[in-house]
């Protein structure tokens, strides 16, 4: 499987000279399956550039899958600007979490009402299907994709995608169930040592994954003022991923206030923490344009 990051920012797009390296577009990742199928992970503002590239490279009609973790703005605002949706003959299957009083289709239609956007959902020329997903194991785009609830203020799913003996987890957005990760801080390191059952379940979901993409919007110092907003610290993410014996960890959903220099320091501190835990896990702050093979 191949991945390309088209948007790594959380909350709101933040273009400017201070975000040139890590990027200012909100959440969007392109996954290409071993069979050459395209799966779009979230449709934040990064989806616009991805859509333009898909059209430029298309030799025929575009058929793709869109997996939405949830429907907060930073994960769907690129949907109306995703140009392949406007092309007759293209086909898309769009999946997102059940649990709202509105269907996934109705939520996406809501942001495209004429109050907010000149083109309504029903005017899109591509063939589009919508499905509300529950927790569990699903067969999507020829792959086994598991979905699990994240700890976030709206209905949100994390995904584990399996192909060719490899697993990729995409986990955004998620807040720790307990600020203290370990039962005994003097003995960290294993899933069984994690204090809260919710955090243990979260770690189990990514156990043994070759590659995990996890939101890490805050530092531990910032978190107390952001409690219950539905986001993690890099320290929490490194600890649960190390306990789950993840091989490669990519931190994303960067806070809009974090410029390139700040995120380089986050990356340094996250790697240092992994080393302190005795984990060989590779830790990277994801940036726009980053391409990864899993």
Residue ranges and their predicted role:
Residues 178-281:
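Cap/insert and terminal regions of metallo-dependent hydrolase folds
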Residues 1-183, 260-294:
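Binuclear metal-dependent hydrolase catalytic cores
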């Amino acid at each position: 499987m191949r991945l390309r990051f088209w948007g790594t920012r959380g909350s709101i797009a933040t273009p400017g000279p201070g975000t040139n390296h890590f990027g200012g577009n909100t959440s969007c990742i392109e996954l290409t399956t071993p069979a050459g199928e395209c799966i779009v992970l979230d449709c934040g503002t990064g989806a616009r550039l991805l859509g333009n590239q898909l059209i430029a490279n298309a030799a025929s009609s575009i058929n793709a899958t869109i997996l939405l973790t949830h429907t907060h703005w930073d994960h769907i605002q690129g949907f109306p600007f995703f140009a392949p949706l406007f092309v007759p003959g293209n086909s898309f299957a769009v999946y997102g979490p059940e649990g709202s009083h509105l269907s996934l289709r109705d939520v996406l239609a809501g942001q495209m009402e004429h109050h907010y956007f000149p083109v309504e959902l029903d005017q899109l020329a591509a063939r589009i299907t919508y499905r509300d997903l529950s927790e569990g194991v699903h067969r999507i785009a020829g792959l086994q994709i598991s979905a699990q609830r994240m700890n976030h203020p709206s209905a949100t799913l994390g995904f584990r995608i399996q192909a060719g003996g490899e697993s990729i987890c995409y986990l955004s957005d998620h807040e720790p169930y307990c600020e203290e990760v370990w039962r005994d801080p003097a003995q960290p390191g294993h899933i069984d040592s994690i204090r809260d059952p919710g955090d243990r379940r979260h770690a189990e979901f990514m156990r043994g994954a070759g590659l995990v993409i996890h939101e890490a919007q805050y530092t531990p110092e910032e978190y107390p003022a952001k409690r219950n907003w539905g986001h993690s610290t890099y320290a929490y993410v490194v600890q649960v991923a190390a306990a789950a014996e993840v091989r490669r960890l990519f931190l994303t959903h960067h806070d809009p206030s974090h410029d390139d220099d700040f995120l380089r320091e986050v990356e340094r501190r996250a790697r240092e923490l992994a080393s302190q835990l005795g984990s060989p896990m590779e830790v990277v702050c994801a940036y726009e344009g980053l391409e990864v093979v899993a």
